Design a protein with these regions (language model features):
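General small-molecule cofactor/ligand-binding pocket signal
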Residues: 67, 120-122, 346
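Conserved PLP-enzyme active-site core in the AAT-like
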Residues: 45, 75-245, 328-329, 356
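Non-catalytic terminal extensions of PLP-dependent enzymes
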Residues: 1-65, 82, 189, 239-261, ...
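Short strand-loop junctions, especially beta-strand C-caps/beta-turns
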Residues: 71, 125, 149-151, 319-323, ...
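A short, small-residue-rich loop immediately preceding and capping a beta-strand
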Residues: 64-70, 97-100
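Cysteine-centered functional microenvironments
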Residues: 36-38, 68-70, 149
Length: 438
C-alpha cells in the first residue's frame, strides 16, 4: 500500500500526498549532487534556499528566529527545551519542571526528561481541553515550560491558549507549541500571536515530505528574539555583500544537535511545497484538512462515538468502547479488519485519554469519494460478525503475529527454511491486550 495511491488515515501523522514535483526538483544534479564539505562559495544556491526557508518558517509561526538543524520533531522538542534551559540558566533561575497535558504526544515527556527537567502531567477537563484549575495548581516558580499541542491530539483547538500564555508569562515561564498539528491552522493563526515562545515544525508532515521507512524527517524550531542566542550553531546567515554563509560565532548557543545543515533533502522539499502553495494555498490546505476531517467524522460517529466535541479540527478520535463492551470487538480488531478492505489502519489506543481510541486524520489531499468509501468500510465492519472481525485480516499471508515478541526479539534476516510456514502457525491470533499498536 503506497501513500501515492492509497488512503492512510493515521491520526497525528498527516499522511498527505507527497508532490512528485518536489521529488523531481530534489533529484536535480544541482541539489542531489551537493556535498556538505564543499566550500561555502560553491553552496550559495542551497544556502540561499535554507536562509529563505528560515524566514518563511519564522513568518508562518509569527516568531523571530529559526534553526533548521534538528532532524526530527522529537529532536526539535529536545533542542527547544535545551534552549529554554540555557535561557533560565543565564538568568540564574533554577526551574526544574515542564508541564505537559495528559493528551500530549509521548515524545513530550521524553524530551523534557532528556533536557534535565521533571515532566509534570496536567489533566484534561470534561471537554478534552487543558484543565485550567489543575494547570494553575502546578504552575509555580519551578515551572520552566508548558508544552501544548494545539489543536490537541483529540483534534480540538483549545481556546484557552491565550489565557494559558498570560498565566505562564506572569510567572516568567515559557509556552512551547508542539507543531505536530500545524496542518490544521496554516494561514489561520500564527502561534506567536497566541503567546507561544518557542515551537517545532514537522516538515515531513505539514509540508509534505515523504515518511518512507520511518524517515528521514526534520524538526526546525522557531523562537522569540530573547531565545535566539541559544539556537544551535551554526546558523545560515546572509552576509553584508549579499552572499550566504554559516554563522559559527554564537557564544551562548547550545551547540550542534545535528551534523552539517540538518536534513537538507527534507528541508528542500518543504521549501518547494511552501513556495508552490503560497500564503493563500497554505490557508486552503488547512481549510480542506479541517473540512475533510469533519465530513468523515459526521459519516461514522453514529457507529463509532466521538467522546469530545461536536466538531473537530484536522483529525478526530472515535472510540470502539461500546463495540468492545457489547460485541467483544476492540479498536485493534477494527484496524486489522480494515486491511481486508485495502485500507491502512488508523492510529489506535492513542491518545490515552480515550478508551479504545481510534484516531483518524484524512488530510486535505483526499477526495470526497475516498472519504465516503472509507466510511462505508468502517460502517460495514461495525455490523459484521464479531468473530470475523476478531480473526482479521483474512486476506494477508500472515494474519496476527505476536507484535510484542516481534518488537522485543526482532528477526532481521530471512533464511530459505522460513519460506514456507504452515497456515495454522501463520494465523495464530495475538492475545487480547498483548499489543497496543498496529
Amino acid at each position: 500500500m503506497s501513500i501515492d495511491g492509497n488512503f492512510y488515515p493515521l491520526g497525528s501523522c498527516t499522511m498527505k500526498y507527497n508532490p512528485k514535483r518536489n521529488e523531481r526538483l530534489a533529484g536535480l544534479p544541482g541539489v542531489a549532487g551537493l556535498h556538505p564539505y564543499q566550500d561555502e562559495s560553491t553552496l550559495q544556491g542551497m544556502l540561499a534556499i535554507l536562509f529563505e526557508l528560515q524566514g518563511m518558517l519564522a513568518e508562518i509561526a509569527g516568531l523571530d528566529a529559526v534553526s533548521l538543524q534538528p532532524a526530527a520533531g522529537a529532536q526539535g522538542e529536545l533542542t527547544a527545551l535545551l534552549c529554554a534551559a540555557a535561557y533560565f540558566r543565564d538568568k540564574g533561575e533554577k526551574r526544574t519542571k515542564v508541564l505537559i497535558p495528559d493528551s500530549a504526544h509521548g515524545t513530550n515527556p521524553a524530551s523534557a526528561n532528556l533536557a534535565g527537567f521533571q515532566a509534570v502531567t496536567i489533566r484534561s477537563n470534561g471537554q478534552g481541553l487543558v484543565d485550567l484549575d489543575d494547570f494553575r495548581a502546578h504552575l509555580d516558580d519551578e515551572a520552566a515550560v508548558f508544552m501544548i499541542t494545539n489543536p490537541n491530539t483529540i483534534g480540538l483547538f483549545d481556546p484557552q491558549i491565550g489565557q494559558i500564555a498570560e498565566l505562564l508569562h506572569e510567572r516568567g515561564a515559557l509556552l512551547y507549541l508542539d507543531g505536530a498539528n500545524m496542518n490544521a491552522i496554516l494561514g489561520q493563526v500564527r502561534p506567536g500571536d497566541m503567546g507561544v515562545d518557542l515551537m517545532h515544525y514537522n516538515p515531513h508532515k505539514t509540508f509534505s515530505g515523504p515518511h518512507g521507512g520511518g524517515g528521514p524527517g526534520a524538526g526546525p524550531i522557531a523562537v522569540r528574539a530573547h531565545l535566539e542566542p541559544y539556537l544551535p550553531a551554526p546558523m545560515v546567515r546572509q552576509n553584508a555583500d549579499g552572499t550566504y554563509g554559516l554563522d559559527h560565532d554564537r557564544p551562548r548557543s547550545i551547540g550542534r544537535v545535528r551534523a552539517f545543515f540538518g536534513n537538507v533533502g527534507v528541508l528542500f522539499r518543504a521549501y518547494c511545497y511552501i513556495r508552490s502553495q503560497g500564503p493563500d494555498g497554505l490557508k486552503a490546505v488547512s481549510d480542506h484538512a479541517v473540512l475533510n476531517a469533519n465530513y468523515l467524522m459526521a459519516l461514522v460517529r453514529h457507529a463509532y462515538p466521538v467522546p469530545y466535541g461536536d466538531r473537530c479540527m484536522h483529525e478526530f478520535v472515535a472510540s470502539a468502547r461500546s463495540l468492545a463492551r457489547d460485541r467483544g470487538v476492540r479498536a485493534m480488531d477494527i484496524g486489522k479488519r480494515l486491511i481486508d478492505y485495502n485500507y491502512h489502519a488508523p492510529t489506535v489506543y492513542f491518545p490515552l485519554v480515550v478508551s479504545e481510541a481510534m484516531m483518524f486524520e484524512p488530510t486535505e489531499t483526499e477526495s470526497r469519494d475516498t472519504l465516503e468509501a472509507f466510511a462505508e468500510a468502517l460502517l460495514a465492519i461495525a455490523a459484521e460478525d464479531p468473530e470475523t472481525v476478531k480473526s482479521a485480516p483474512l486476506t494477508t499471508p500472515v494474519s496476527r503475529p505476536d507484535e510484542v515478541l516481534a518488537a522485543k526479539q526482532p528477526v532481521l534476516k530471512w533464511t530459505p527454511d522460513e519460506a514456507v510456514q504452515p497456515a495454522a502457525q501463520e494465523r495464530q491470533p495475538v492475545a487480547s491486550g498483548q499489543a497496543s499498536f498496529i
